[in-house]
From Swiss-Prot:
The lineage of its organism: Viruses, Duplodnaviria, Heunggongvirae, Peploviricota, Herviviricetes. Glycans are attached at N40, N52, N117, N150, N166, N331. Belongs to the herpesviridae glycoprotein C family. InterPro entries: GA_GC, Ig-like_dom, Ig-like_dom_sf, Ig-like_fold. Residues 37-58 have a biased composition (Low complexity). The keyword ATP-binding does not apply. GO terms for cellular component: membrane; virion membrane. This is Envelope glycoprotein C. Pfam families: Marek_A (PF02124).
Length: 480
């Protein structure tokens, strides 16, 4: 009986230690408690010896991976990392809404810039204008949107604005329409301090260019700088002028694309009665630069001549490239007119020269020239006679008294449209001999005139002598 109780007690005691080992193994996955010889816990057999059970040893082992379980802790998603946005505007020295604006000629342009670090007592802003991006004073074309540090305004610019005008160097050159007392004012800067708005009242070829914004503290006004480029564009105005031609002259028409900018490319395509003109010898195009932009003139000459068929209708198509990606296209049309070739005759009747021109348009008149004199002779009346049978034309006649000094006479028609060649008639006539009595009268008049002139000179000289003598005597009496 006693031995049975002892055995039962030893068995219960062993079971208790096995339970403790299992609990400790589950509670600490990083440590394994072994009983008896070294080895894995799964291979160690529990010993019933009280001596072995009373002296357990612990051996540290590397952590073992745990099997995945369906617990909530294992299925929870990790927290997302905090989002990092752009830096705050307060850390940026400037922020402009437009660094390369392109606007129409004559429009009003606004450029807004923010200066987060500015204060009312320390902030100073200057804006300078340069004609072009590659100005010799600037050097290479500056980078837009780049903020430069400790860079003063390059030489050669014109000052547009200074927030501290009392500190402006008196030797600076103000841009036209800027500075104290400018009228009319072309530039203005408005808005609260730190949020400045540059306003260009009228964008032209003179007000476009590179604008350099330089700012900083009052004692360090060139701390930062940035460039803004302002560009202007001006679409061309298109006009067509079909030339009036005389019978036998080739038809012509001229198209003009005027005052456009920039002058990249202005291309003309010509059509005559709906058919394109391909022969480059028939088209002459020339471009010139003016103070207000560029102008291109293109003239087409037809192979057909007036009077041998109906008048021709010309169409010019203009393609203007504003930049490398934008272009506009316009058309203009007109019909040429044909004028009859006039007949001009000259005759001398008595003491007059008579010039007659038939089939001239309304508004045409005469101009007379004598000898080598390039200036017209005295104005003479022009009489219009009957029509020559064509609508809008008439026969006109003019008379001119003959000259006693000249023998060559030119009768020229004036008032024809541009492009019509000079129409004139030349004639010769010997001046008639003068009447002897008339010559004597002329000589008598000339002699009388000379005598009167001499008499007037003598009277004036005598009066001067008398006046000087009287003045001298009066002065002598006063001295005595």
């Amino acid at each position: 009986m006693a031995l049975g109780r002892v055995g039962l007690a030893v068995g219960l005691w062993g079971l208790l230690w096995v339970g403790v080992v299992v609990v400790l193994a589950n509670a600490s996955p990083g440590r394994t408690i072994t009983v008896g010889p070294r080895g894995n816990a799964s291979n160690a057999a529990p010993s019933a010896s009280p001596r072995n059970a009373s002296a357990p040893r612990t051996t540290p082992t590397p952590p073992q991976p745990r099997k995945a379980t369906k617990s909530k802790a294992s299925t929870a998603k990790p927290a997302p990392p905090p989002k990092t946005g752009p830096p705050k505007t307060s850390s940026e020295p400037v922020r402009c809404n437009r660094h390369d604006p392109l606007a129409r000629y004559g429009s009003r342009v606004q450029i807004r810039c923010r200066f987060p670090n500015s204060t009312r007592t320390e902030f100073r802003l200057q804006i300078w204008r340069y004609a072009t991006a590659t100005d010799a004073e600037i050097g290479t074309a500056p980078s837009l949107e780049e903020v430069m540090v400790n860079v003063s305004a390059p030489p050669g610019g014109q000052l547009v604005y200074d927030s501290a005008p009392n500190r402006t160097d008196p030797h600076v050159i103000w841009a036209e329409g800027a500075g104290p007392g400018a009228s009319p004012r072309l530039y203005s800067v408005v808005g609260p301090l730190g949020r400045q708005r540059l306003i260009i009242e009228e964008l032209t070829l003179e007000t476009q260019g590179m604008y350099y914004w330089v700012w900083g503290r009052t004692d360090r006004p060139s701390a930062y700088g940035t460039w803004v480029r302002v560009r202007v564009f001006r679409p061309p105005s298109l006009t067509i002028h079909p030339h009036a031609v005389l019978e036998g002259q080739p038809f012509k028409a001229t198209c003009t694309a005027a005052t456009y900018y920039p002058g990249n490319r202005a291309e003309f395509v010509w059509f005559e009665d709906g058919r394109r003109v391909f022969d480059p010898a028939q088209i002459h195009t020339q471009t010139q630069e003016n103070p207000d932009g560029f102008s291109t003139v293109s003239t087409v000459t037809s192979a057909a001549v007036g009077g041998q068929g109906p008048p021709r209708t010309f169409t010019c198509q203009l393609t203007w490239h504003r930049d490398s990606v934008s272009f506009s296209r316009r058309n203009a049309s007109g019909t040429a007119s044909v004028l009859p070739r006039p007949t001009i005759t000259m005759e001398f009747t008595g003491d007059h020269a008579v010039c007659t021109a038939g089939c001239v348009p309304e508004g045409v008149t005469f101009a007379w020239f004598l000898g080598d004199d390039s200036s017209p002779a005295e104005k003479v009346a022009v009489a219009s006679q009957t029509s020559c049978g064509r609508p809008g034309t008439a026969t006109i006649r003019s008379t001119l008294p003959v000259s006693y000094e000249q023998t060559e006479y030119i009768c020229r028609l004036a008032g024809y449209p541009d492009g019509i060649p000079v129409l004139e008639h030349h004639g010769s006539h010997q001046p008639p001999p003068r009447d002897p009595t008339e010559r004597q009268v002329i000589r008598a008049v000339e002699g009388a005139g000379i005598g009167v002139a001499v008499l007037v000179a003598v009277v004036l000289a005598g009066t001067a002598v008398v006046y000087l003598t009287h003045a001298s005597s009066v002065r002598y009496r006063r001295l005595r």
